[in-house]
């Protein structure tokens, strides 16, 4: 996992596909876009613009992805995201790996939380369990941008 703020320069060189995704986040006015999917580089890099209300962590299920990495960016609002390394000991709640490239767990072993504010981003790789959309202080309306980068696009 990589955690940062879009206003800060990248501390090191990242794969070109991730740099392209971060450049898109820096250059886009998300207030001007409706929720939905925007392709950046076909199915190699695309984004989901999502408006939601944060919920208690116990209501949200931890998740992992196997074919894409997630770059989760907060445009407005505030949220916590649960994070952990996938130890292989988490009980599967629902597997939609073939249909949607997602596995949900009942819970997440050794979970910590990061706090997201507008401009924050977190990059989740296949071994990173994450539980997005959790309340920080109180329920909050947020706009979250999730950029999906195909593992095959990394070089």
UniProtKB/Swiss-Prot annotation:
GO BP, one example? response to radiation
What does the record list as coiled-coil region(s)? none
The UniProt entry, under InterPro entries, shows:
NanQ/TabA/YiaL, NanQ/TabA/YiaL_sf
User: A Pfam family in this protein?
Assistant: DUF386
Q: Where is it found, in Gene Ontology cellular component terms?
A: cytosol
User: SUPFAM superfamilies, from UniProt?
Assistant: Clavaminate synthase-like
List the NCBIfam families hit by this protein, alphabetically. Answer: YhcH/YjgK/YiaL family protein
Q: Which family does it belong to?
A: Belongs to the TabA/YiaL family.
The molecule here is called Protein YiaL
What is the native source organism of this protein? Answer: Escherichia coli (strain K12)
